[in-house]
Amino acid sequence: SCMDGKSWEQYMGGNVSLVAKDNSYGIALYESYRNRNPYDRDDDGFSELGKLNMNTFGFRAYYRPTHFSRINLEYHTTNEFRRGGNKFDLQPHESDITEQTKHIINSGGASYDLFWREYKHKISLYGSIQHTDRNSYYGAQQDMNAYGKTDDLTWVAGGMYVGNMNNCFFAPATFTGGLEYQNNSLHDVMTGYHRDMKQDVRIASAFVQNEWKMRQLTMLVGARLDKHNLIDKLIFSPRINFLYKPTEDFQARLTYSTGFRAPQAYDEDLHVTAVGGEGVQIKLADNLREERSNSYSGSVDWSTHLGHWQANILLEGFYTDLRHVFVLEDIGKDDNGDKIKERRNGSGARVYGVNLDAKLAHGKEAQFQLGFTAQRSRYMDAEVWTKVDGEELTTKRMMRT
């Protein structure tokens, strides 16, 4: 493809699958290549869409030792280069501004499933691992100090039991319970900004849920218990869901769920953003607490036939209450003159809104789709977002960049 006759993009992909006649084993492989030249819409020398070069490869395979067991294997690799800014024929530190990343990602996983009693019960053991090697540059005005390197290793192991019951108290039900352990080791180095960060995150979890299925009503109740090594106490996260479906054309859903974000470094914290030609770094406050969320949502989904046409309307409302919400505040500059923003706990925030999706289709010949979302995100109290001439500027709006 070509954008405005200026920027070409090439894509090539392929896949192949092999399955045994008796379905005892199978494998699927895929490969893709994508290359896009930088796109400068207004000819000012700076890209609106950056340069992209990406290669991916992977496979999924399974083997059934018996009729009631299954082994799954998978592997994926991605080699991706992205660069935005100007002067693409020069090194990043020779340009006026450049944001550049090169990722080499390797991931794989394995699982073992064992069924019994005519597939009504199942035990699953699983594990996965991913390694990411990233080299980056985030800088402006020929900054030699903006190079960085990140090494990230994550692995997960766990087990799960699923049991189908003909009657559990008052209705047929499916019970799910399990244990899981996650480990993440991160090492991020950006010598120009005197940053050498090492972070080890370990999370041990237990989860249970039970889903009752009745003629018109489905009810799901579950909970998760997490022990995060950066949080002193256990985190309890319940959830409940109701689905009411009186007819094939109409259904309504109510959901309550909880969650948390740990006081740790996230991907966006590893970037050094260029604002006004200055580098801006993010650090964590010493007494940072976890961010907790309570989310409520409800929706109605209605389908009908209008002659030869089929129509569908989905209306959804959502509300999320955030406690100890993460906010960023200026705390000055470092020895290199770069701005430092600190992630702290704010007073709280609310995110709420409505979503509307409408579809109209005439078989496979034509389809029209309309979507609309109205959302508002507000802090409970005004939070400081920047300083101008020593004066703190506050806002209740959750800023987005």
Protein language model features and the residues they cover:
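Outer-membrane beta-barrel transmembrane domain signature of Gram-negative proteins
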Residues: 101-108, 129-218, 351-352
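Structural signature of Gram-negative outer-membrane beta-barrels, strongest in the C-terminal barrel
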Residues: 66, 170-176, 180, 194-321
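Short loop/turn motifs that connect adjacent beta-strands in outer-membrane beta-barrel proteins
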Residues: 20-25, 67-70, 116-122, 164-174, ...
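Outer-membrane beta-barrel translocator/receptor signature
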Residues: 1-43, 50-57
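Flexible loop and strand-edge segments within Gram-negative outer membrane beta-barrel domains
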Residues: 36-56, 64, 68-121, 130-152
